[in-house]
């Protein structure tokens, strides 16, 4: 099993990409009739307790530089929403600064071949760059598969409760390639292969649960 090394040479991921996200209300049938305040209030555990799917809002994603959206980039010269936005993550969703999943709608283009844009804040990580550094190091290890990453400077304009608004600086995020069929194909592996999601990933001993196979209580 080998990664597609050439994939990491297509784009320069050493700098910072600027993204502009305008959020607005959608409709009940698509679960997008919510406020931006609601999106940032509830954690994954709150949704489980309420027994509802994670709230979403409509989003207009535009990519550019610090001067604004750029021609040729996704969302340029676009007025209508081209995406949906919701929180992502599990434990991290309890932080005040959320991680976001921005999913571009069908026929609304893609960004670097990706329609799902995962933006991670890493609020619990003081330096904010260790995750990207880890993926950058993985690129040099032939025996490991990696994911594409990019630092993102995010600006958000909230129109969910007002017809007017200004872009607010949300600071630095790390965009991490969403591991799905599109990513599997891009990395040169079987897009129909099986993906498994780990529900619990920790390094604690749990002596009352983790036992040797020779233990009678195994």
Q: For the regions a protein language model found, what residue spans apply to each?
A:
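Phosphate/dinucleotide-binding and metal-coordinating scaffold of catalytic cores
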Residues: 1-218
């Amino acid at each position: 099993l080998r990664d597609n090394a050439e994939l990491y040479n297509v784009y320069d991921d050493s700098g910072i990409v600027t993204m502009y996200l305008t959020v607005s209300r959608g409709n009940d049938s698509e679960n997008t009739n919510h406020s931006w305040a609601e999106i940032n209030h509830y954690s994954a555990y709150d949704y489980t307790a309420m027994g509802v799917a994670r709230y979403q809002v409509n989003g207009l994603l535009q990519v550019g530089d610090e001067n604004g959206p750029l021609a040729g980039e996704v969302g340029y010269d676009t007025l209508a929403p081209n995406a949906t936005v919701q929180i992502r993550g599990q434990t991290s969703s309890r932080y005040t600064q959320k991680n976001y999943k921005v999913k571009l709608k069908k026929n609304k283009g893609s960004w670097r071949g990706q329609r799902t844009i995962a933006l991670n804040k890493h609020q619990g990580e003081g330096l904010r760059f260790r995750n990207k550094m880890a993926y950058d190091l993985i690129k040099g290890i032939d025996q490991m598969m990696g994911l594409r990453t990019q630092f993102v400077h995010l600006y958000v304009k909230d129109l969910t409760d007002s017809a007017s608004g200004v872009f607010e600086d949300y600071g630095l995020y790390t965009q991490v390639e969403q591991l799905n069929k599109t990513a599997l194909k891009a990395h040169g592996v079987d897009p129909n292969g099986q993906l498994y999601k780990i529900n619990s990933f920790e390094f604690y001993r749990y002596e009352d649960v983790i036992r040797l196979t020779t233990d009678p209580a195994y």
